[in-house]
UniProtKB/Swiss-Prot annotation:
Its cofactor is Mg(2+). InterPro entries: GlnE, GlnE_rpt_dom, NT_sf, PII_UdlTrfase/GS_AdlTrfase. It catalyses: [glutamine synthetase]-O(4)-(5'-adenylyl)-L-tyrosine + phosphate = [glutamine synthetase]-L-tyrosine + ADP; [glutamine synthetase]-L-tyrosine + ATP = [glutamine synthetase]-O(4)-(5'-adenylyl)-L-tyrosine + diphosphate. Belongs to the GlnE family. Disulfide bonds: none annotated. Involved in the regulation of glutamine synthetase GlnA, a key enzyme in the process to assimilate ammonia. When cellular nitrogen levels are high, the C-terminal adenylyl transferase (AT) inactivates GlnA by covalent transfer of an adenylyl group from ATP to specific tyrosine residue of GlnA, thus reducing its activity. Conversely, when nitrogen levels are low, the N-terminal adenylyl removase (AR) activates GlnA by removing the adenylyl group by phosphorolysis, increasing its activity. HAMAP family: GlnE (MF_00802). The keyword Nucleotidyltransferase applies. This is Bifunctional glutamine synthetase adenylyltransferase/adenylyl-removing enzyme.
Amino acid sequence: MSSAPPFAAALAWSGHLRRRLDAHPDLAAWLANACAHPVSANVLAAWQAELSGPDAPEVLPVEQCRGMLRKLRERVFLTLIVRDLGGQADLEEVVGAMTVLADIAVGTAYRSVAAELAAVHGLPREQSTGDPQEMLIVGMGKLGGRELNVSSDIDLVMLYGDEGETDGPRRISNHEFYGRLTRRMMPVLSEVDADGQVFRTDLRLRPDGDAGPLAWSLDALEHYLIGQGREWERYAWLKARLMPAQAFADSNPDAQARQLESLRVPFVYRKYFDFDALAALRALRERIRQDWQRRALARNGVDSANNIKLGDGGIREIEFIVQLSQLIRGGRMPALQRRGLLEALHAERAAGLVPEGDAQKLEAAYRFLRRTEHALQYREDEQTHLLPADPAQRAALAAALGYEPAAFERTLAEHRAFVSQTFRNAFRLAGMGEEDDSPAPARTHANGHAMRPHAGALHDIEERLAGQIQRDFPEHAEDLLRRTETLLGSHRVRSLPDSSRHRLEALLPAALTAATQTSAPMDAALRLFDLIETIAQRSAYLALLAEYPDTLARVARMVAASPWAAQYLTQHPLLLDSLIDWRTLFEPLDFAQVAHQLAADLDACRLPDGEPDIERQMNLMRDVQRQASFQLLAQDLEGELTVEKLADQLSALADLLLAETIRRVWPLVNRRPGAEPHLAVIAYGKLGGKELGYASDLDLVFLFDDDREDAAELYAKLGRRMTSWLSTMTSSGRLYEVDLRLRPDGNAGLLAVSLEAFEQYQRSHAWPWEHQALTRARYAAGDTEAGARFERIRADILVMPRDVQALRGEVLGMRDKISAGHPNRSELFDVKHDRGGMVGVEFVTQYLVLCHAATHRVLVNNLGNIALLRLAGEAGLIPAPLALAAGDAYRTLRRAQHQLRLKGVDKARVPPGQLAAERATVCELWQTVLQDGTIAQAEVK
């Protein structure tokens, strides 16, 4: 037996290693050589070939396969003992080697048994193509996540594509073929003989567990997951991975692999989070807490403190913490859709879901506990997670891991205490509310449907609501009773299943109560009923509002404050669950983080063949835009944002989404490897002036700076695809309406224009109104060099010498056209378009820039109307007091327009006596600057 330094720690701890070296003295030299290199996939492949023999057939006979795999497993296990305990192998090497071993073992056993069966029964074939049909072997749990421990069992689910039968002389159904194949494979892997075993195998994670068939068709799996799939199965399928096993020549399982992934992903990661699922996940957490007790009893009551997997602060709790956020948010954040635990934890940290410090502590705890777990299993090659109770053995374990006993116990206690505390707070950390705010469990009917208080027939709830309405809404009782009758009589409500109807019966009285606590109870009640009717068929949202009273109260306040907000929520109920974590909703938008996470999530939207899933990407961008806008809306309604700050934020969001659109669309149109897009997206209008509203269109111009021969065609195609990407109506709605008419020559012009052509057009062919529009234009997204060149061209155009009188006439003429295009035949004042309104300020500002930018270059900067007026006043171009007063008036007019829009008013108009001082100031500014004698103070309504 060798006692060389690399073996010292391993020999001192592992009785299994000592016995193997005693029984096979020649093994020491081989092991010393093997331990000099990492145990990689290539190393395992070489060992497999060596153990199979130089003349081995491509497919080993079953008995030869059994022996080879057991010897291979022994090599891997012994090498890892020495390398791991000697400090040479990190966690990634250990779990990676065991996972590669499992892939080899399962694939080799499958090929051997399948060949034996096919020799008797023939090949199972696909009905559509006639090609040989493989069995799909799915690795679950740690095998799926490539995280196997060194003495792990493996969880497998066996699937296949088409029903049918084999093509041999003794034909059997495909179903029977795969069932027999599974049954015969298991002993090859798990039966213990003189050489030990390869892996214990567990098939109980298949649908219906031990009561179900050994192999399931994909169609049967789909029906099961849709109709009977439970929350714990979502947890189980999160890591599911199709293993690389192929037995038949000329088979092509790619289509079935894609079908499997198309079933797995939406089952595990739901876009619309089901709040029924939240209760189930809480129950799952309790099961994890109690699981160790059940197993401990089976081991004569071993204290949970010694179980580093199932006990408090153990590995299972870390897995739940990480996977909870994946299950809750992974449907909307594809970057979280990772099988590996550490990969997922890193993604959650990058997404801001787990604080940096907590993520580091969780990873450190996980690595420590997994290494300890492996050391326990190295000792006697047992699947154990129990720390020794004997102090001497405990000290020996610490020494094997490189610790003094006291330091080991201290480190272990610190890690487990942190994990345990984090586990208790898992739902709060996942953004699903405080732990003590969790809803009370629902009572249950005998048929299994959830039952809420006051359950009964619809006419009973109508009677109860009538009494509540007459008491709390006496002045509007008749209208609200009529709306209640309409709601309860609607097809959406009458067709509800029992569970949803019971929830509705609890929700409606609660909604009325919440409405009474708002500033506009009647409006809030009607709008809540509209929202409830819209979401009635989505049980998840009924559950949310029924079981989270604080969230219902927040919704009531929002819809009372703004009918536009009520309509927005009704159109996008996906936003409702963001109201659970109210504090997060009021955090400032971190655009760098939004951009980083969006890019990561879009990168993760892949089809099974690796190509981008464009539909998912487009929907994801729309969902992100809605979520960010809703966050701003919540802050807006609570008075946290000025109109200017809100517009800045909405404009920054649009810039971010434009930049990401270029990145996603460019590879779809460019066929030249490595080429970068030299496109600048120029924002005009509200986006150009950073005055964007919640529902504003984007006025865009596409400019390119690229000398490749096909540039004009390429960038026109890019512009078309970008416009489609932004404005196409998908299942998540439309990102933005896009208006491209401000490009050179308008609708008659090219969709994308070179910078040279743009400059020439602006110098020689542009109308004065196009130069007016240019004052509000800016580079928004795309190639920064092209953007900088545009800004230089813009500045050069704005400082061109102009005939002031001619310009004045053009501006006045364009103002008249604007007025004619927006006639106001009412007695109300149109805040934007009437004389004395916002357009007047904007035209004056544009006129001042075009007249005076040559001598006052500061006016070239796109600073917004208020800042430019102030600069004009400071330069003496207009009276400074008037400049400040006009800026204040413009700010007030914008605020009034914004408030009217939030109230759902289409045209921002107010009574004639309102905003009179602001209108007078704007008219004075107009007369002072443009000397328009036809616009007199007396003409203001």
